[in-house]
Amino acid sequence: MRKGTVKEVLAKIKYDPRENEEDYYIIIEHRGSYGNVRKIPVRIIELGHGYFFIGETQIPYHRILKVVRKDGKVVWESRKIRK
């Protein structure tokens, strides 16, 4: 697993030319969805200061549970899950 904040990990995925954002997705806590989680491709999100955006919808970073590569490798995981 990579070290750093979820925002740092996402910034590396989105802006480092060695990474391909198409290869990653995030799992967020999303009440009302099946299992209360939602899978979102990294390519459709925009990073903000305390939030990330999907279109005009802003979602706080603390709702991200995992960042996962499409081969299933978890590259970042929330402390909520690690407990």
UniProtKB/Swiss-Prot annotation:
Coiled-coil intervals, chain numbering: none
Protein name: UPF0248 protein PYRAB10580
InterPro entries cross-referenced by the UniProt entry: MJ1316, UPF0248
Native source organism of the sequence: Pyrococcus abyssi (strain GE5 / Orsay)
Pfam family, one: MJ1316
Family statement: Belongs to the UPF0248 family.
